[in-house]
């Protein structure tokens, strides 16, 4: 398995993986919207993505955004983590998380957050999986407003 940081030329494969992820999880963004956003995402210095390859074929992806706040300074969020169903339980997700965390450390992030939806937790036991990687529940809730 090879894991590397996505380049602008990887926007297509990244978008294809994320489109599958969004469709599986029932997220609203269409494949066309995801493809368009991949170019923008990869052009932003505060963002990055990692791709995992098995035998030269994309097997998974992770996306990371960073910001800066008064409470913790530089911080990051792992926005998306997806591994193709046939490639799961082989360490691909763990490798992507390790690469993302290393990048966050290099950028000087004080902490890294991940949002686990109730559906994702019920389907994939994500809360326990992330806790096993050292993530803790903060007790904070995320409220969102569409603009």
Enumerate the language-model features and the residues they cover:
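Short coil/turn segments at alpha/beta junctions that flank glycine-rich nucleotide-binding fingerprints
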Residues: 90, 107-110
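Acetyl-CoA-dependent GNAT
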Residues: 5-73, 79, 97-98, 103, ...
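Extreme N-terminal starter segment of soluble prokaryotic enzymes
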Residues: 1-2
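Conserved beta-strand-loop-alpha-helix junction that forms the acyl-donor binding cleft
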Residues: 113-126, 147
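Conserved acetyl-CoA pyrophosphate-binding loop and the N-cap/start of the following alpha-helix
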Residues: 87, 91-99
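Mid-chain, well-packed structural core segment of small domains
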Residues: 78-85
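Conserved acetyl-CoA-binding loop of GNAT-fold acetyltransferases
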Residues: 109, 130-140
